[in-house]
């Protein structure tokens, strides 16, 4: 069964989080640039240049978003350049944004890596006359941006609990593997999950533990939690790397019968689902987020009406639908 949570055009994107966030930064890590896409003729784009700054380079969520951006750019006749730091960290993302501001594109699509730390560099872009669209993650103060486009992350967290609840009708203990505090999207997913747990007295939440976006750390958390509390019936991994690590932790613990629901649907997560280590994946719509980001930027540049907040939906991928056209379409891409 494919369960799609419908997106709505005026949702609260303040609840968004990274498609996948990355581990704390090494100052030596630099940006990974992707060649510009010289878009073919299209309608409504003019000769605009759009910069896309990913949350982190090499992450299938942001790669899939980049694909959507490039597809929209080709259709609308604009040029797109993509950059991203090697780790999900504002100290690495800030100099990339500073360099983008110096290059003076017409618009900037960006997934902020921190709700407060990225406000200053993004404000600098706004002050320079660059139209800014926030994609995936957001800011504590998003004033001055054209639009915020993100998944309904609170709803996605609740949907993750629904999957665990359905597999464990008698209830039990559940655990959340988050990324780190202060990331808008993953915080919202945990919030939605915890709120849903609280509505069913048969379940007890063991709270949120943070993996710092490191699969190895997520594996350690899961292995340790299962050793300390064998009554755990379900684990919610709040992003791609947490899900990858949770699957590893389950294997290392040698425990069966645990329902693991992962957020995001990269190749490793799909393989874990097919192997039976993970029972469900909450797949976002990163390509759709990217396409809508381009559309909102161009609308603003053309003096047309824009939407300040847009929420996109989800598809729940399970063993039953992973090999169907719907399941394959929902899985993330490793390249465009």
Please place each PLM-identified region on the residue numbering.
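C-terminal motif of bacterial Sec signal peptides marking the signal peptidase cleavage site
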Residues: 3-7
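A residue-level marker of the well-folded mature domains of exported/periplasmic proteins
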Residues: 8-336
């Amino acid at each position: 069964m494919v369960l799609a949570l419908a997106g709505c055009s005026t949702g609260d994107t303040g609840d968004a989080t990274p498609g996948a966030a990355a581990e704390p930064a090494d100052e030596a890590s630099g940006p990974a640039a992707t060649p510009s896409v010289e878009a073919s003729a299209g309608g409504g784009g003019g000769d605009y240049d759009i910069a896309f700054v990913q949350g982190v380079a090499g992450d299938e969520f942001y790669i899939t978003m980049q694909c959507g951006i490039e597809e929209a750019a080709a259709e609308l006749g604009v040029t797109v350049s993509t950059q991203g730091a090697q780790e999900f960290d504002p100290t690495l993302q800030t100099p990339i944004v500073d360099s983008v501001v110096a290059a003076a594109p017409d618009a900037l699509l960006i997934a902020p890596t921190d709700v407060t730390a990225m406000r200053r560099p993004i404000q600098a872009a706004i002050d320079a006359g660059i139209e800014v669209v926030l994609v995936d993650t957001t800011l504590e103060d998003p004033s001055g941006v054209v639009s915020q486009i993100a998944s309904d992350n609170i709803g996605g967290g609740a949907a993750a609990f629904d999957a665990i609840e359905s597999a464990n009708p008698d209830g039990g203990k559940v655990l959340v593997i988050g990324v780190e505090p202060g990331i808008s999207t993953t915080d919202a997913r945990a919030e939605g999950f915890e709120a849903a747990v609280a509505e069913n007295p048969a379940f007890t939440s063991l709270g949120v533990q943070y993996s710092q976006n490191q699969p190895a750390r997520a594996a350690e958390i899961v292995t340790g939690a299962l050793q300390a509390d064998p009554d755990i019936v379900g684990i919610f991994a709040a992003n791609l790397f947490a899900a990858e690590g949770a699957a590893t932790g389950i294997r290392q613990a040698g425990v069966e019968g645990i329902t693991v629901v992962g957020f995001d649907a990269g190749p490793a997560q799909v393989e874990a689902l097919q192997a039976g280590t993970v029972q469900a994946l909450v797949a976002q719509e990163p390509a759709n987020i990217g396409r809508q980001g381009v559309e909102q930027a161009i609308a603003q540049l053309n003096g047309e009406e824009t939407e300040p907040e847009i929420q996109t939906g989800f598809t729940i991928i399970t063993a039953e639908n992973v090999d169907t056209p719907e399941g394959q379409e929902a899985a993330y891409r490793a390249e465009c």
